[in-house]
């Protein structure tokens, strides 16, 4: 006796999610994530571990996204303390901000170990498996293409992302510029400034480097990493889920 094949298959079986895989997207591409029910543009700024650097562990091997425009202006910390791990901005990024993302986004974003300078007058960089466990984070100065050859006070708390250009030339600066309400504005980084305990690096409104006290309200551009298997809708480029 043979087995009957029911036309249409199992009606309870979910259809596979299809779309454009994050890992196939060109660096510089724009995609969309949902924030508070609104589709917001993010740029693909790197594929894989930045510069294949051992500062990053395998958790950072994915598709790096950076919010195209500045989200808002807020202080890095409530006091002039540049200890990133305990900062108000790290708490906000992984709390209030992350909770505004859609359920698809929250499920897809990777938990990673990001390299970071301890701060508070301590220039030690914790990296690899000792990095800070986060889902959303600020970029560092080296990731934007600056190094200690540009300014001694830059800590080596990351390596250049593919989207950015090394140095301080006009084209390198142009790629770092971000806007708030359609006007270029300064945005803050996770890199503490120098050996002091109260200031942090920022990217100014011309794309050059600057710094500010940690309690100053500067622009915030959240970054996050998706698995390369995450899928985007072919028409809208909105994140759909994972394969």
Each PLM stretch: what is its role?
Residues 1-11:
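Short, intrinsically disordered N-terminal pre-domain segments
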Residues 11-243:
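Collagenous Gly-X-Y triple-helix signature in extracellular proteins
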